[in-house]
């Protein structure tokens, strides 16, 4: 046979994939850095949040849960004392365990972070390296883009940031 000649003969030959979308946003407050994808971006802000406010990991968690119809981050990790100041990496690990229990694994992520300042281009490689370490994904399966909102709205006024993540899970 030829490996490039892919054929579908039985149901098991089909890849079982699920796709989910996630979103998160937080206001800024005075601080010593923004947690973005498990990497602390140095600046004069931090996220005003119940946990570490890592908008990338929180949106990733939402996308993974959504792909399997398991609710959202607030369903599993509500704003209670138990989850106060939780790190996004820890919440991701718990979510990943849920996904694995359902027979799925994270296969690919595509991320868009929207903020005016700080510019993330300088930190892009560090953020991707952090995400690679946390998720176990190859760099080629991590899409990361940083955008501005062209000075419009709360993001444009540098009052906060937002993130969208699409995740693909495979069985």
Task: Give the predicted meaning of each segment.
Residues 23-40, 132-141:
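Acidic-glycine-rich active-site phosphate/pyrophosphate-binding loop
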Residues 155-171:
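C-terminal edge-of-domain segments
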Residues 1-20:
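Conserved alpha/beta core of the MobA/IspD/sugar-nucleotide pyrophosphorylase nucleotidyltransferase superfamily
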Residues 110-119, 123-156:
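Short, conserved loop-to-beta-strand elements that form functional interface hotspots
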Residues 41-51, 79-83, 151-155:
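A short glycine/serine-rich beta->alpha loop
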